UniProtKB/Swiss-Prot annotation:
Topological category with respect to the lipid bilayer: Multi-pass membrane protein
Cofactor binding summary note: Binds 1 Fe(2+) ion per subunit.
Activity profile over pH: Optimum pH is 8.0.
TM helices/strands, residue ranges: 1-21, 36-56, 57-77, 91-111, 127-147, 160-180, 210-230, 244-264
Name of the protein in its database record: Beta-carotene 15,15'-dioxygenase
InterPro entries from the UniProt entry: Blh_diox
Substrates-to-products reaction catalysed: all-trans-beta-carotene + O2 = 2 all-trans-retinal
Binding-site positions, Fe cation: H21, H78, H188, H192
Lineage: Bacteria, environmental samples
Amino acid sequence: MGLMLIDWCALALVVFIGLPHGALDAAISFSMISSAKRIARLAGILLIYLLLATAFFLIWYQLPAFSLLIFLLISIIHFGMADFNASPSKLKWPHIIAHGGVVTVWLPLIQKNEVTKLFSILTNGPTPILWDILLIFFLCWSIGVCLHTYETLRSKHYNIAFELIGLIFLAWYAPPLVTFATYFCFIHSRRHFSFVWKQLQHMSSKKMMIGSAIILSCTSWLIGGGIYFFLNSKMIASEAALQTVFIGLAALTVPHMILIDFIFRPHSSRIKIKN
């Protein structure tokens, strides 16, 4: 699968703008540690984080189609949770499914020819069962979109409805990687930065947040660069780049989602209630 210039630009956006949003995870972890041995505990958390990411990365190459399915599923929840928390509505799960499924369910199906090639590169072969499962996801997503759109229009939350509709049309007309990069970088990552900065500015120093984010971003880029050059010795540049970016992103999403959606958001909510 050859990539156009616009596709390379989209991948660059994902790597240099989207990926760093997860680099704040060290500052997030540090902010939740209250004991005196904060550095030692932070090191332990980061080690577990790295082990989870590495384990998923290795599992991907043993069970690629299954791993891709898991990546799509957790991305629906992770993206949807971030969008819901940014602009809550009455129907929580239709909101999560509708927004989280745009780039993970709707995009693959509406751009099936292009995404089939992408999935084949990521899994080293065809994935017919995955497409059958995506059709089931699409049914759930369609119901979620209908319920969510009705509720947002009924309650006059027009900006939420228009964002969803705009993304649906973008996925229809734009190249798949452009749609993904647009959502991942300028909606999901921007909201994540805003949420984390707001939560941490009273708990952590700005220097520590920025410094740790820079260190982890640079480390991720160096590791990713090494993986890319290794893969490029075995396959063409475009395929090596796609595997590096998306399999690497999937591996990092697992510990990132656990930390953000299952630990940090509930932790932040408890602090907000106490205050």
